[in-house]
């Protein structure tokens, strides 16, 4: 009996441990996956400034390319693909928050014209779903369905991101018209250098906050350094804290200048932005164009037939 109770207690403890582990994993994964878009969403009402600059560039300081591809024209109430490409060397490793090296992640923000939005799941074809994979998109704001964000997601798998977009219908939305519209995109690979509060991450270069002699370098137990800089004129000492990740460039006894780099720049990523244009095409205009082309083709056919008939008449008159 005692053995049975003990076995039952062990099973209960194992089940509880598994539940706690799963909960911690879910919470951690959620916080990581939503971190980057939340930085912009919490700090800015609109991700695109009046100057045209996308706010992600405030934290991701290096400039890198990004490309967006959309159809030249779409019909109303149609699902189409917006393809965002974030190219980078897949062999590169970035500095993680704990100072270790790991793969790069990517993220993107897609700013569509008013009325365009993420396509509902039931409107997305199986072929498009296969291209999208396990990506989960979200609106920048509940009232800004035309602005979509994604990331961070593993760059090895998602350096090309497919956004399923639903075009608006002017027949049901009077604020939308059959016009040419701009589309803006921003894409980053790797971690940022600045946090929204203005503090540095460990994915950037650290500079000396004072001039003087490097009097002491203490390597911290969990990584990183404490660098003591002494002013030889008055003996005043300043301590610069270096987090785990960047490589140290100075040594004890070295004379340094104010703002001189103390570390290398570990950043291998960067942010880029681009734009494209799309035409919301009027179906009646397309039908009119098709009718016009058909009439031109028919006119050409009749002209050829008429010419052949005229040649036959001429030939008959010559024989007569």
From Swiss-Prot:
Heme binds at residues 36, 56, 59-60. GO terms for biological process: photosynthesis. The chain crosses the membrane at residues 286-306. The keyword Hydrolase does not apply. GO terms for molecular function: electron transfer activity; heme binding; iron ion binding. The keyword Signal applies. Its main location: plastid. Keywords: Chloroplast, Electron transport, Heme, Iron, Membrane, Metal-binding, Photosynthesis, Plastid, Repeat, Signal, Thylakoid, Transmembrane, Transmembrane helix, Transport. InterPro entries: Cyt-f_TM, Cyt_f, Cyt_f_lg_dom, Cyt_f_lg_dom_sf, Rudment_hybrid_motif. Gene3D superfamilies: 2.40.50.100, Cytochrome f large domain, Single helix bin. Residues 1-35 form the signal peptide. Its cofactor is heme. Pfam families: Apocytochr_F_C, Apocytochr_F_N. GO terms for cellular component: chloroplast thylakoid membrane. Component of the cytochrome b6-f complex, which mediates electron transfer between photosystem II (PSII) and photosystem I (PSI), cyclic electron flow around PSI, and state transitions. The 4 large subunits of the cytochrome b6-f complex are cytochrome b6, subunit IV (17 kDa polypeptide, petD), cytochrome f and the Rieske protein, while the 4 small subunits are PetG, PetL, PetM and PetN. The complex functions as a dimer. PANTHER family: CYTOCHROME F, PTHR33288. Belongs to the cytochrome f family. This is Cytochrome f. It comes from Jasminum nudiflorum. The lineage of its organism: Eukaryota, Viridiplantae, Streptophyta, Embryophyta, Tracheophyta. The gene is petA.
């Amino acid at each position: 009996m005692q053995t049975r109770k003990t076995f039952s207690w062990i099973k209960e403890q194992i089940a509880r441990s598994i539940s706690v582990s799963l909960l911690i994993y879910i919470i951690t994964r959620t916080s990581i996956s939503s971190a980057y878009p939340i930085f912009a969403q919490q700090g800015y009402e609109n991700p695109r400034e009046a100057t045209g600059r996308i706010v992600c560039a405030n934290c991701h300081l290096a400039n890198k390319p990004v490309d967006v591809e959309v159809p030249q024209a779409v019909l109303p109430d149609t699902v189409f693909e917006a393809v965002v490409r974030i190219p980078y060397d897949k062999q590169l490793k970035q500095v993680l928050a704990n100072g270790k090296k790991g793969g790069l992640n990517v993220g993107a923000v897609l700013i569509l014209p008013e009325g365009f939005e993420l396509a509902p799941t039931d409107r997305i074809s199986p072929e498009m779903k296969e291209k999208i994979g396990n990506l989960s998109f979200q609106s920048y704001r509940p009232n800004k369905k035309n602005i979509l964000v994604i990331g961070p997601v593993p760059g090895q798998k998602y350096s090309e991101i497919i956004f399923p977009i639903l075009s608006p219908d002017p027949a049901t939305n009077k604020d939308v018209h059959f016009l040419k519209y701009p589309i803006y995109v921003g894409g980053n690979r790797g971690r940022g250098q600045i946090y929204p509060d203005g503090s540095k991450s460990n994915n950037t270069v650290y500079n000396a906050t004072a001039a003087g002699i490097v009097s002491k370098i203490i390597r911290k137990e969990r990584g990183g350094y404490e660098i003591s800089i002494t002013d030889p004129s008055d003996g005043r000492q300043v301590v610069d804290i270096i987090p785990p990740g960047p490589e140290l460039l100075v040594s004890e006894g070295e004379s340094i200048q104010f703002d001189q780099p103390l570390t290398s720049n570990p950043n291998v990523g960067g942010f880029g932005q681009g734009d494209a244009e799309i035409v919301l095409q009027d179906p009646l205009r397309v039908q009119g164009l098709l009718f016009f082309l058909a009439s031109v083709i028919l006119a050409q056919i009749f002209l050829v037939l008429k010419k052949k008939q005229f040649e036959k008449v001429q030939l008959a008159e010559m024989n007569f």
